[in-house]
């Protein structure tokens, strides 16, 4: 067991009940273009086209052969683009159940399927995009390979679902997915989990590793740091546990599996719980009549690193297993910094709230202050458990010094790894955004 001592479990109200419920009927789904780092689409459909489930919607010009497929059958009703014609979303009105099917196999055959057959089926179905590389967090090139694949079978994000609840419901498909992953690498498949018991693969290159401790103990960046540190040469792939289930279902049934169990939670959710829905589901429909009155912000993903779901991107993200909802923090407290703050959370113990152990806080979107200088008072070291110098790294990200940032370990990180640093930062810096700009420059300059 690897125990993490530094980190932070956010004491936020609205913890979900760990019982899976059926969600609302979804009539619109979407693929979100901006989720895929560096992707430039070649469109295969236009508004008005009828599509089947698993039919190709677009390909990636920069990553030849990688296909992005429809999560449902129906009609393309929107192709939304933003500044500089960047693809925001392809929206489909769900109708019918027509789908493209693929080869199916017996569970005993999966580990003996040759690698090229596995790759071809994953690419044609669109499930290849469930894999992401580290560094850079991009969909891997089809002809690439890796010595390490990480399966994230735990989740320490605030308000997250417990993976064992979902995995044990789909144990056969989960094991089948692990068998499929074992064929994609000559190296190891690392299944990273908490202390709970999970279904196990019998393949010799599939290993289980137990992590314990506060967030970010459940992030793949933390797992890689301790088990297989990545750099420009050592490239690892990662996948979440629900996509492992989708891999297994694809090869067992020959059908694209797009079901998702997400946590619908937060301080303004009426009944926080686990909800069964599908990839790309409209979050306006999913949260209809589920929220308390008032101005709220719906987030696809975690409250720490998720994306505001509004307008053309108001849909469940490809890699997100949560829908979090917070009240918009428009109100200002007169001399709030001088008040005792019984109902306020503070990492630096500035308010009385830290004295009430176990108290959950109705957090909002407010930053509790304006932008200011970066102040190194030890906050970053408290929440980043990786063996690196966070203050120096974050300073280099702010200054745009990519050479120094790379030496300090920037290639190991993704936006979610620095989300807690953003949360505890007195200067209100968005370190995830600064990291992405740094990684883009490093990749561009080779």
UniProtKB/Swiss-Prot annotation:
It comes from Vibrio anguillarum (Listonella anguillarum). HAMAP family: NqrA. It is an enzyme of class 7 (translocase). The gene is nqrA. Keywords: Ion transport, NAD, Sodium, Sodium transport, Translocase, Transport, Ubiquinone. Pfam families: NQRA_2nd, NQRA_N, NQRA_SLBB. GO terms for molecular function: oxidoreductase activity, acting on NAD(P)H, quinone or similar compound as acceptor. It catalyses: a ubiquinone + n Na(+)(in) + NADH + H(+) = a ubiquinol + n Na(+)(out) + NAD(+). GO terms for biological process: sodium ion transport. Its EC number is 7.2.1.1. The keyword NAD applies. Composed of six subunits; NqrA, NqrB, NqrC, NqrD, NqrE and NqrF. This is Na(+)-translocating NADH-quinone reductase subunit A. NQR complex catalyzes the reduction of ubiquinone-1 to ubiquinol by two successive reactions, coupled with the transport of Na(+) ions from the cytoplasm to the periplasm. NqrA to NqrE are probably involved in the second step, the conversion of ubisemiquinone to ubiquinol. InterPro entries: NqrA (IPR008703), NQRA_2nd (IPR056148), NqrA_C_domain (IPR022615), NQRA_N (IPR056147). Belongs to the NqrA family.
């Amino acid at each position: 067991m690897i125990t993490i001592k530094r980190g932070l479990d956010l004491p936020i109200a609205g913890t979900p009940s760990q019982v899976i419920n059926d969600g609302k009927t979804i009539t619109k789904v979407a693929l979100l273009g901006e989720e895929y780092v560096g992707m430039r689409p070649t469109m295969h459909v236009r508004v008005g086209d009828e599509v089947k489930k698993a039919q190709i919607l677009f390909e990636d010009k920069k990553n030849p052969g990688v296909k992005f497929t429809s999560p449902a059958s129906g009609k393309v009703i929107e192709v939304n683009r933003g500044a500089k014609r960047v693809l925001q979303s392809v929206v489909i009105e769900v109708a019918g159940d027509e789908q493209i099917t693929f080869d199916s196999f017996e569970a005993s055959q999966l580990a003996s399927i040759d690698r090229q057959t596995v790759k071809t089926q994953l690419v044609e179905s669109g499930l290849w995009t469930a894999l992401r590389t580290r560094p850079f967090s991009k969909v891997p090139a089809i002809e690439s390979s890796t010595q390490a694949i990480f399966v994230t079978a735990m989740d320490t994000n605030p308000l997250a679902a417990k993976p064992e609840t979902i995995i044990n419901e789909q144990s056969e498909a989960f094991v089948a997915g692990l068998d499929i992953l074992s064929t994609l690498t000559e190296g190891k498949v690392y299944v990273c989990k908490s202390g709970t018991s999970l279904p196990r693969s019998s393949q010799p290159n599939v290993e289980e590793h137990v992590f314990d401790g506060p967030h970010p103990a459940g992030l793949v960046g933390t797992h890689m740091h301790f088990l297989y540190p990545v750099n420009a040469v050592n490239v690892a792939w990662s996948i979440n546990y629900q996509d492992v289930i989708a891999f297994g279902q694809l090869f067992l049934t020959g059908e694209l599996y797009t079901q998702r169990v997400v946590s619908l939670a937060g301080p303004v959710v009426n009944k926080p719980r686990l909800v069964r829905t599908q990839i790309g589901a409209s979050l306006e429909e999913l949260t209809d009549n589920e929220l308390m009155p008032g101005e709220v912000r719906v987030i696809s993903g975690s409250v720490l690193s998720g994306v505001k779901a509004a307008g053309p991107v108001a849909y469940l993200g490809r890699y997100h297993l949560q829908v979090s909802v917070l009240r918009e923090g428009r109100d200002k407290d007169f001399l709030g910094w001088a008040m005792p703050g019984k109902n306020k959370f503070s990492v630096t113990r500035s308010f009385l709230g830290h004295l009430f152990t176990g108290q959950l806080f109705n957090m909002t979107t407010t930053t509790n202050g304006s932008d200011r200088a970066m102040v190194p008072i030890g906050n970053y070291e408290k929440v980043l458990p990786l063996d690196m110098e966070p203050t120096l790294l974050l300073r280099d990200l702010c200054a745009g010094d990519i050479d120094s940032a790379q030496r300090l370990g920037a290639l190991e990180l993704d936006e979610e790894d620095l989300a807690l640093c953003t949360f505890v930062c007195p200067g209100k810096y968005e370190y995830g955004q600064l990291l992405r700009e740094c990684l883009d420059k490093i990749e561009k300059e080779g």
